[in-house]
């Protein structure tokens, strides 16, 4: 029985490895990209054995599937310890862009930031404001790649109370982060946009409503209020199981993903719940006349579609609104459809209009 179970376990490991190589999910591969996988096929065919009944083989496969999946994930992480996209968000020179670490002066303290510039340079820039409990690099690599490919620079900042920012999360001082970032960027770029995710969207919208001048504002999954239960948290975790998210393992291991979720506690003089209520994203958005993009996830268990509808009802007529099917709170910023919408809208808003005006 143990021998049959072991063969079933190896069957799954070989099958998973073949799939990982075919899909280029190197973060789930224990063989790596250079070794030939065709050599595994004969073993896969012969593992059942001649004298094993089909029912016994299927039962062994069912028992071996869960541990085999865990072993595959763990082996991929051990085999590829440096396969993490966060390495591409460190200061330095890369094939497509350069990254400079900044401490932008503020009235009190400073604003830590990463300045990402395409190799060919850029005339327009997007300041990215992260969500609660995150930092400037949180799941930002796909967004960085998307915008750099479209000729846009980025400024990734740490909000008060988060990451390397020495200041405490408080209201209304947190909106100074967006103000200082935009002022710094205005001195260097012709067109400037703000993009805020969740809490960052609330901060960005309030800053613009209070007078910060930008050429475009994109707000992703910003809550009018926080109302969720532990059951909603479980629903959000289940929503992580999305087929399109498996492609994240092209350049990331499971261990790297888990580490990307590890953040120190927020240093706060006001709770995130009270801060979001004070920022009043719906009231802020209603006052904004700059080009405006709103995106929410239809499977978001934290900012539910009913709350997205509340925000949509308050939007000015010129705003673009998208409710993306299948996207949850944690997966929205990684969703290819969302990245396509954001990238195309920002490119059109920040780069295309001036070119069209000069050609007519």
PLM feature spans:
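Short alpha-helix in the alpha/beta-hydrolase fold that links the catalytic acid
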Residues: 290, 304-313
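Short beta-strand/loop motif that positions the catalytic acidic residue
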Residues: 287-288, 294-296, 300
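Catalytic histidine-centered segment of alpha/beta-hydrolase-like enzymes
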Residues: 327-337
């Amino acid at each position: 029985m143990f021998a049959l179970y072991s063969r079933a376990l190896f069957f799954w490991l070989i099958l998973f490895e073949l799939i990982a190589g075919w899909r280029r999910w190197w973060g789930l591969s224990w063989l790596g990209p250079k070794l030939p996988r065709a050599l595994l096929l004969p073993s896969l065919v012969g593992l059942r054995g001649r004298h094993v009944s089909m029912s016994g083989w299927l039962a062994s496969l069912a028992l071996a599937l869960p541990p085999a999946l865990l072993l595959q994930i763990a082996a991929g992480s051990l085999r590829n310890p440096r396969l993490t996209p966060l390495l591409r968000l460190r200061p330095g020179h890369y094939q497509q862009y350069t990254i400079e670490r900044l401490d932008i002066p503020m009235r009190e303290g400073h604003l830590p930031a990463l300045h990402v510039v395409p190799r060919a340079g850029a005339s327009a820039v997007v300041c990215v404001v992260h969500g609660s409990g995150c930092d400037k690099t949180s799941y930002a690599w796909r967004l960085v790649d998307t915008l750099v490919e479209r000729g846009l620079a980025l400024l990734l900042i740490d909000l008060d109370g988060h990451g390397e920012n020495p200041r405490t999360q408080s209201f209304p001082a947190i909106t100074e982060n967006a103000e200082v970032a935009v002022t710094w960027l205005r001195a260097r770029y012709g067109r400037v946009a703000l993009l805020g995710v969740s809490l960052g969207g609330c901060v960005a919208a309030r800053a613009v409503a209070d007078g910060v001048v930008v050429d475009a504002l994109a707000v992703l999954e910003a809550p009018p209020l926080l109302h969720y239960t532990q059951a909603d948290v479980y629903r959000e975790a289940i929503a992580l199981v999305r087929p399109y998210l498996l492609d994240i393992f092209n350049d990331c291991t499971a261990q790297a993903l888990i580490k990307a979720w590890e953040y120190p506690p927020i240093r706060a003089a006001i709770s995130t719940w009270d801060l979001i209520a004070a920022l009043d994203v719906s009231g802020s958005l209603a006052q904004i006349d700059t080009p405006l993009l709103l995106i929410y996830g239809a499977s978001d268990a934290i900012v539910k579609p009913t709350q997205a509808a509340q925000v949509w009802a308050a939007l000015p007529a010129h705003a673009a609104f998208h409710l993306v099917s299948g996207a949850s709170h944690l997966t929205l910023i990684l969703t290819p459809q969302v990245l396509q919408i954001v990238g195309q809208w920002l490119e059109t808003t920040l780069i295309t209009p001036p070119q069209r005006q000069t050609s007519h």
